[in-house]
């Protein structure tokens, strides 16, 4: 019988000291993909522009690209685009109004099954 593997468990406080780009989902670290492909960046840019245009007259809500969202003590995510109504200090620490993930072959499995 083989040995049981125990996955490491981390908190956002530990995550803050790491090098590189990581998401932390229920205490489990996930390395983030390298810089997105141009097609992906254009999609994100187009969505940002459209949402920004629609929210132009709203004084409380803003559109953000890829900011850190601390969901709880052991989960920090970086969605591709968010609509947030309220002030953000260092990172988002409350639920956004809208979260957008642009799926790619490299990230679809994690984004669909682990992240949201």
Placement of each model-derived feature along the sequence:
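Gly/Pro/Ser/Thr-rich low-complexity, intrinsically disordered segments predominantly at protein N-termini
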Residues: 1-116
